[in-house]
Design a protein with these regions (language model features):
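Short, basic/aromatic recognition patches that contact phosphate-bearing ligands
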Residues: 1-76
Length: 76
């Protein structure tokens, strides 16, 4: 189970890094098509998304922030 979360964190970091700035909706749409989406969820739940952002900071020291007009981005 922990490995699955770790892989999700890496996936989220890679998605945001690849796009520079990306909307919450676009992240959710990409999640719906991801191979890591083992439950076949049609979106990435909001609470899960924010928990992942917090865990990414705690685990890797990578800060993900949101610019309301541009979307999510890696701040450091």
């Amino acid at each position: 189970m922990a490995l699955n979360y770790f892989n999700r964190y890496i996936w989220l970091i890679e998605v945001i890094n690849r796009h520079g700035h990306i909307s919450r909706k676009d992240i959710s749409d990409l999640w719906a098509r991801s191979q890591l989406n083992e439950l076949g969820e049609s979106y990435l739940p909001e609470r899960t998304f924010h928990n992942h952002i917090s865990s990414i900071f705690d685990t890797f020291g990578i800060e993900i922030k949101c610019d309301r007009s541009l979307g999510y981005y890696i701040a450091n």
